[in-house]
């Protein structure tokens, strides 16, 4: 009896620790990317790429290719399709996003339903299954995540310049189109990595909410990126702990924890200078 | 004398018969333009006359659909676009904005801010600046790069009249001090810099060009500005006696339609009251 309890604790410890390690790793990668999503007003764009991941899942099963690779390719293609349609179509970006976002999701769901020979746990893909994270998944998050962050660090100045003003960036040799394209690839990679942890439906919230929560504590873009990573990590720790405590689904619990952090960041503390400084007079 | 001396100066940008075609019409066409080191070239013309398009072609933000644009190899451009909007969520101080497209020497940043008259705002967040302050910050940013070519798209937006004179004087001083070339847009037909070497009037194509000295003799100039601002301001006043058709052809005042308008002639020094069928933009 006693031995079984101890054994249970060890097992619990193990999968919970794995979930924590995976979630914190993911939060660190997602924070800086999420900042760019917020600065560039790309929230819906990120959502569209994430939704297209389900089509990636279905195609990966159909052609029996690596799931992560399949999701990465489909998400990247979805973003390219959007860029193409933006340039050559007549519909507004908003309408295009609506079409791509929901049609890729629906296509994925329909295809999965047709593939009756495979049993796919749809809920795990839609809402994540962080408690089933394997050592391999952790290696993937840290390996892939480190690569994403390295590329982002290298891309930082051109991407930030393109975010502030693409024309200045182009005039001063920063090649904003290239920066934007590489950023899309980074987003696709992050979605492929994050899918298992938080699920397709909730990836965007992990991009945006920690970044928004970090805004109030940041005076430079770089500090905001770090603050977003920290806020994300706190949300993961809080959400997972609560999920264990109250037996709630892990992905949504993490998002709720992030939301609470964001709401807390809105509270004005009397001893903290929160308003942006404006020391000068008007011309 | 100065004028002939400049002919020997290095050519920074050279445009030959350049044009941009969008959605079935020419935004601007047949532009021949050269900016040399130490030269100030001012583009003027009514709204939609292709001033910004021309400037964007000159610095490589837009590619010409016909004709050619040649830039000096490794030309360093400092660009102030017409409109820059930065999302509130991006924490960006004026100081940080300075280093947007390249790391800068701290001293040079300070000097540029001083020259633009906003040294006291170095630590302010850009979103809190007034229109005029932000315009100065963008100018300081372009200056701090010590560019070969300074390109300013309506630099006096949001700046009051005295600020306007000061800003034009500043641009002229910068040219004298650093020897850079300046390509400048002014939408205000009545105000162009006396320090300008060449004034080019655009209206879908180059209508006319000339030295401001020619313009200074105009009786309208004396009537409007007197000797008061004689060192800084000049009036550039003429009537357009032809209309540009959607297909790029030109209808002249007498109703005949020709392929371009280089065949006829504008006279800046006189009031062109005879232009009955034209779209006069003289106020």
Curated annotation (Swiss-Prot), chain B:
It catalyses: Zn(2+)(out) + ATP(in) + H2O(in) = Zn(2+)(in) + ADP(in) + phosphate(in) + H(+)(in). Residues 13-228 form the ABC transporter domain. GO terms for cellular component: plasma membrane. It is an enzyme of class 7 (translocase). The keyword Cell inner membrane applies. SUPFAM superfamilies: P-loop containing nucleoside triphosphate hydrolases (SSF52540). InterPro entries: AAA+_ATPase, ABC_transporter-like_ATP-bd, ABC_transporter-like_CS, Metal_Ion_Import_ABC, P-loop_NTPase. GO terms for molecular function: ABC-type zinc transporter activity; ATP binding; ATP hydrolysis activity. Keywords: ATP-binding, Cell inner membrane, Cell membrane, Ion transport, Membrane, Nucleotide-binding, Translocase, Transport, Zinc, Zinc transport. This is Zinc import ATP-binding protein ZnuC. It comes from Chelativorans sp. (strain BNC1).
